[in-house]
């Protein structure tokens, strides 16, 4: 799924991998809460972002979903004064949970991202 989100959606900016301490700093999620994850953020001045997380269990996944929703709110607050044109992307962000999987996608094409994420 991560590769589909990276390859099948056109991004304005290059996305870079987020790992280790940076992952915890950006999302407030410790590596102990997750079994595996892939996270990518914009290298420049866009809000574009992809995060796919496999949580330890469904309760943790629910908590992670809340943290990703908080990330979206923080990004909106930050970009409103910084680069207002990015707010539309943030307003259309997808934060999705299915079982132990939690996904965040911020892009120009939220419809396509949602199709990739949900399979619908």
Name these PLM-found stretches.
Residues 1-120:
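Soluble, non-membrane globular domain cores that form compact, hydrophobic packing
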């Amino acid at each position: 799924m991560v590769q589909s989100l990276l390859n099948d959606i056109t991004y304005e900016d290059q996305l870079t991998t987020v790992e280790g301490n940076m992952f915890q700093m950006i999302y407030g999620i410790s590596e102990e809460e997750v079994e595996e994850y892939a996270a990518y953020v914009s290298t420049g001045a866009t809000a574009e972002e992809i995060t796919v997380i496999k949580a330890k269990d469904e309760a943790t996944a629910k908590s992670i979903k809340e943290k990703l929703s908080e990330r979206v709110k923080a990004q909106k607050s930050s970009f409103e004064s910084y680069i207002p044109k990015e707010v539309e992307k943030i307003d259309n962000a997808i934060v999705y949970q299915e079982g132990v999987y939690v996904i965040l996608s911020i892009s120009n094409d939220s419809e396509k991202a949602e199709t990739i994420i949900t399979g619908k």
